[in-house]
Amino acid sequence: MPKREDISKILVIGSGPVVIGQAAEFDYSASQACRSLREEGYEVVLLNSNPATIQTDHEIADRVYIEPITVEAVETIIRKEEIDAIEPHMGGQTALNLVVSLKKMGIIDKYGIKIIGTPVESIEISEDRQKFHDFLISIGERDPERYRISRSNYKEEIEKIPFMPVIVRTSFSLGGSGGNIVKTKEELKAYAEELFRGIDEDYIEVNRSLAGLKELEYEMIRDSIGNCITVCNMENLDPMGVHTGESIVVTPSQTLSDIQYHMLRDAAIKIVSGLGIVGACNIQFALDGNDYYVVEVNPRTSRSSALASKATGYPIARIAAKIAVGYNLTEIRNPITKNTFAAFEPSLDYVTVKIPRWPFDKFSVDRTIGVQMKSIGEVMGIGRTFEEALMKAIASLDIDLSYRLRLYVSDEEIWNLVRTPNDRRIFAIFEALFRDFPVDRIMEESMYDRYFIEKMQNIVDYLKTLEFGHIPENLISLKKLGISDEIIGRTCGIDPDEITRYRITNRILPVFKEIDTCSGEFEVIAPYLYSTYEDEDELPGISGFVAIIGSGPNRIAQGLEFDYGAVKAITALRKMGVGSVMINSNPETVSTDFDVSDALFFEPITVEHVSNILAKANLRGLIVQFSGQTGQNIARRIENVLGSSVVMGTSSESIDRIEDRSLFSKRLEAMGIDQPKFEVATNAEEAINKSLALGLPVILRASHVIGGRAMDIIYDYDFLVERSREVFENVNSVLVSKYLENAVEIDVDFVSNGEDFQICGILVHIEEAGVHSGDATMIFGPKIVPQAAEEKIKSIVGKLVREFNLIGISNLQAAIKDDEVYVIELNARSSRSIPFISKATGYNWVELAVSAIMTGKLEKVSVSSKGYFVKVSVFPFSKFNDMDVSLGPEMKSTGEAMYPGFTMEEAIRKSILRDIKSVFISVRDDDKPRIIEAASIMKQNGLKIYATMGTSRYLRERGIECETVYRIKDERKPRIYDMILAGYIDLVINTPEMNAGSVRDGFKIRRLCVRKGIPLVTNINLANAYSKCLSYTNIDYREISSYH
């Protein structure tokens, strides 16, 4: 069929800020879709509030709106842009839910909008669990036994359920939100009561639990005339009961019989055909022998779609977009080969393994995993065998266990970890095998298939042959199993880099194989490569190319913002006529799309794997500035292994001098640059004594970390003792620095060539200094930094550029207090704020940095902005019930949103995504004088103010009327907790107290705000900023270039 001619302008809705369950994979999907639609001559308008995405560049879409993803914004865009059609399938649950709302509110019909791809009616059937159940019955398929529990009569209805345990599910949810496995009726009643308090739906669904059955996924794609293929099937190592986003997943399935494979494939085709899917679709099955249940359908591109695309090389989102505008699978060429069509099912002659990356290194929370997602990102390993793919995925995780594999805990604890789904279960199984625990019991306790445990046994058996102090003679056999040099070195008691150096010297190197969707039957256009230890090498001629290291799995403090930099760097090299190589292990990202770079190496970002590529490919050099902390930490080691300088831009020597906080602070002192008073401590006792000498509060800062890991503002002696002991469990020295109270923190991004520099922009934190820059609410715009302070900043930047020979892009964090500028930190790399600054200024700063790296020259540019831009962070608090909401020096956010406006008030008001008519205020004594301004403004603007006794008395004494409410411990009514539950409160301002009773009360209130989705402010500066814009009504939604 020819493409549709009845539409010309298409609105693509993005997924918004990165949250758990909805991350970088949707930047990948939407970017592919936009490019695909533009190839066909359609004008593409893109809506997404996330500035860190590639899709919000004008190279991807014709018109870009970085605005709130709301009904109001979409209707404005439809009207302004005269939109013909909406593509909602590339923006995750956010976009799907929004288009369903647009349909129900009559906006789709009002403007005559066409929904391309899978119809809204099919989406509603897939997402509404009752409708989906009825649909399955109608086509002769089945889901688990189910009961619907209503809000009005849940206790009686629960009593009638004839089976336990059950799994609780909600409709239109993301990442398993609201889901839980419940074992008793009393437990279910308590959970239902809690759940109904936090959701708007009048019912929840209860299914018979299928925990323990094998879970399979089929990634399908179908066109409008009924052609349908299986892109791939995926097998979860973890059984049912663990969300597929939390499970280790292998592609293709390893343990299915041919009968089972085709039985599920036939069912998948029947389901997508019955639903009328037009585009991509993911179906999840629970397998019980030769019987099965249908668990769930995602009628859109998803996390699994991105994984399937990278596992097979089949560009699902790109193909789905073309299907959405009328093409059939038989008419669309596969862009990876150009010689085959999209109707050909991919064929794999290799194995991929995906492992999630959890944030438990940042959060001290419950590490068990289940039906709700907790992971932030994921990695994928590719190998010729399951063992090789698994071990490469483990190496890609970049956690301590990646490098040693062993878990040094008691036998009892090992069995607990094997038995209970958690982030360390795969390592506990390895440890059980090292201890010769029975395979049958390991299989029974973990419910892993015997096949996978026996493959892991192969790895353990080889490692057991290693001798301490000797490089193993069977090194090639170990490498064929994917066992990393890190694990071999640590097992043998030899520096892992010495193992890598030995291999390279003795030419024990891998070959590189191409992924082509067709098991090598056709030639590929763009090389997509993985390493393995075989004979035949398919490495293309890439001599003289420049390699960019990616940032690996998304994690707290290192996410989508760094992938943006990597992709823009590759694009810049291409513009300069320089061949580019991408090295990354993250299947969710745009950077690992097959045609972004001239050659893609899907490999772990480790000293070993990067050195292997450099040793074989004769590359011109390596750029590490766009890989977050990962590339910075391994740059010097790679050069030591290879015995040559390969890092381009700022040297690895300068990186080390900057990353070592003690050396850096001493150098600042010698240069006469102001910084907070500091001392260097080499043990816990020193840290305590030097902190007391400086005077509390202080901050303990470790070196070579990202996201302020393990940092806290320390106000009291007991906490000082506790943190000092904890921090020295992992490091040998820390910088003890005086905390600057009531200072304003700033982020300064700049590009330099070792002599000259160009400031990209200065972001001002609204909160006081002490909140991590990745979490802080920031603002950028005209004249927000005093002229005198700006001149001092420029002077400091110039000195740092020349002292450390900074070449490329860098980031300076500083604080302004009493008109003085104090340096906090320097990063000789791209920062989280570079995408934001690039979108706010309309200038490609990464391209300028790459030019400086490649030529040594720095073009002077002049940029200005007519608008103000607010950067607001998004947090994972709803996924971790035992996590406090208060912020500090250690980063907690998963993503960010940008809100632009022609005034500061408009920009800030857009960030508050609801009407505010009432506010609850409870602040500690130190903050009471500073809340007066905000409370007074809010009262003048007609807001109803509620406050706890102490705050209420303080406000009334100063002429601000408010209603007193009581804390939980006061045992009086009205209680603030009940009022929040009942919906009387629209905004909460609560600054944490330090005494135990108040801490417990405040924690419960803050957690309730998270559950109910109520805006929560824990900082007085932010409260003041909000108060000035709550009554602002002159809001408009504009194309991003109108602000430049």
UniProtKB/Swiss-Prot annotation:
The species this protein was found in: Thermoplasma volcanium (strain ATCC 51530 / DSM 4299 / JCM 9571 / NBRC 15438 / GSS1)
A single BP term in Gene Ontology: 'de novo' UMP biosynthetic process
Protein name, as recorded: Carbamoyl phosphate synthase large chain
Residues that hold Mg(2+) 3 according to the record: 813, 825
Region (Oligomerization domain): 399-539
CDD domains according to UniProt: MGS_CPS_II
The keyword Repeat is assigned to this record: yes
Cofactor note: Binds 4 Mg(2+) or Mn(2+) ions per subunit.
Binding site for ATP 2: 701, 738, 740, 745, 770-773, 813, 825
Chain positions recorded as Mn(2+) 4 binding sites: 825, 827
Entry function: Large subunit of the glutamine-dependent carbamoyl phosphate synthetase (CPSase). CPSase catalyzes the formation of carbamoyl phosphate from the ammonia moiety of glutamine, carbonate, and phosphate donated by ATP, constituting the first step of 2 biosynthetic pathways, one leading to arginine and/or urea and the other to pyrimidine nucleotides.
Cystine bridges: none
Binding site for Mn(2+) 1: 284, 296
Region described as Carbamoyl phosphate synthetic domain: 540-916
Binding-site residues for Mg(2+) 4, renumbered to this chain: 825, 827
Origin organism lineage: Archaea, Methanobacteriati, Thermoplasmatota, Thermoplasmata, Thermoplasmatales
